[in-house]
Amino acid sequence: MALPLSVKRQVGFSLTELIVALLVAMILMAVGLPIFLRAYHAYQLSNAALQVADILRLTRYEAIRLNKPVNCVIQPSGSYPGMTVLWADSNGNGIQDPTEKMILLGNAGNLVDQGSVPAASALLSTALNGLASTAPSPSGATVLFDARGALSPPTNVDVFYLANSVSVDAGYRAVLLMPAGSIQIWSGDATGNWQEQR
């Protein structure tokens, strides 16, 4: 007598179920990825603005701590083309020494000229209430803090503009260094609508 063959049931997904699941995942990725990337690029740009504010703040504190004028030097990086280096020149020799604090800005958020920023004049009129402003050049500049931590000369507000060269959707950021040494960070979109972040 022959034993009846038992039908073994297969465990798992059918090909149709797998294709439907992959299709749903691809649709979710297509919708979510651009939103995620836009938020990620905006975050990178805001982080670069915070780094600029931090190195300016640190340079100011170095001037107060050492009780002497200290420069924050801004120049294109010699080692990394397309990047900008900012550092607190505590010893005043104009050379970036290994012991001096520095930041390196890249494509995710780098300094740009005032002319490439939309509605920069609207930002200045809103934020400065008639004070004169200076935009240090991304291709080379210094910001001097005196021994009390005030900007020298104390008549202008220094405005640093940042943009993300990878994504224009990230907008722009502006770091405003006031004559007394306080710092404001402003955020602007691609059309030039500005609002204060900090």
Residue spans for each PLM region:
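N-terminal helix-rich module
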Residues: A2-V7, F13-T16, L22, I27, ...
